[in-house]
Amino acid sequence: DSTRVYVCGMSMGGYGTMDVAGKYPDRITAAVAICGGGNSSYARNLSTLPLWIQHGNKDRAVPSSESTKIYNAIKKEDPTADVTLTIIKGGTHGSVERLFHQRKMYDWMFSYQKK
C-alpha cells in the first residue's frame, strides 16, 4: 500500500530513517527517528512529512544534540512542519529501545496516510 509507507529506526537506524525520509519524502508517509540525527541538507525535504524525533538526554553514544540540531534545521525551513522532538529525561542510548514496544509510537505513525 503506497499510501502507508513508514520508516523508523534507532541509533544508526535513526540516522538511516532521516536519510531515507530526506531522500524520498514523496514515498514516505511518516517517520520516527530514535537516538539518531540527520543531515541538515535534508531539512527542507524532511519538513514535508510527519516526523517524530525521540532521544534520551543521558545518551552517551549519540548526544541528544544531534536530534535537536536536525529538529531545529527542519523548523528553520518550515516553522509549521509536522515534526515533534521528544527528549526523554534520564534516557540513555539503550534504555529508549523500549519505545519500540509502546503502542503510542505505532498509533501515531499509522494515523497518517498519504492522499
Language-model segments: which ranges?
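Surface-exposed acidic, glycine-flexible loop patches that form ligand/cofactor-binding
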Residues: 1, 39-45, 77, 114-115
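Gly/Ser-rich "nucleophile elbow"/oxyanion-hole loop immediately N-terminal to the catalytic nucleophile
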Residues: 1-12, 23-27
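Short beta-strand immediately N-terminal to the catalytic nucleophile in serine-hydrolase-like folds
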Residues: 7-9, 34, 54
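Solvent-exposed loop/turn segments at secondary-structure junctions
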Residues: 11-15, 36-40, 57-61, 90-95
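Hydrolases whose catalytic domains are alpha/beta-hydrolase-1, hotdog thioesterase
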Residues: 16-20
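A conserved short beta-strand
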Residues: 26-37
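Short, proline-enriched alpha-helix->beta-strand connector loops that line the catalytic pocket
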Residues: 46-51
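C-terminal catalytic histidine-bearing segment of alpha/beta-hydrolase fold enzymes
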Residues: 54, 60, 64-115
